[in-house]
Amino acid sequence: MKSYKCSVCGLAFDIQDGEPAVCPKCGVSGDKLVQVSATNKYAGTQTEKNLEAAFAGESQARNKYTYFASKAKKEGFEQIAALFLKTADNEKEHAKLWFKELNGIGDTAQNLLAAAEGENYEWTDMYDSFAKTADEEGFHELAEKFRLVAAIEKEHEERYRALLKNVEAQEVFKKSEVKVWECRNCGHIVVGTKAPELCPTCKHPKAYFELHAENY
């Protein structure tokens, strides 16, 4: 018995012999499947499927309630908007409970890889398939929207992979060339090859520094 986890959709599953060719859930190719230790005690059970459904349901509810809050605010219902947002926060925590049961949260490097693979699936497979189906059924405007969003997901994948490369090379806060660093808390500017351990102005730790960029 071997245990695998899909780096795209997060499905954990077991097989008796050989190696899986595709993910049983999302259909992504076998090179996106990672062999893991049997750490998910729910693997292969109906309970695992229930946890996945619960996570999906709570996640979708959280998003819907934020959209509803925005609409309520525009229509002048401040209290209702606030209650939608409060409930959305509750749903977010519910989703997190089930995602953690599925061992869905790793360290930052693992999370960046999972995010990159997820974005890859969306732009190379999911939206491409959706666009073709929409075209076949005569929904050409929607097909174009699918393709436009797919292009954005491609950018997302590239961003995550660039960040992962920095984490793996320990170059998040240290570069080979002189750079301009900015404290995200107070705006203090430092010029050098690495960020300071503490911000000289607000004393926030190195984690608050990022490369300074002007996009205006």
Regions found by a protein language model. Give the residues of each.
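Non-heme di-metal
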Residues: 2-216
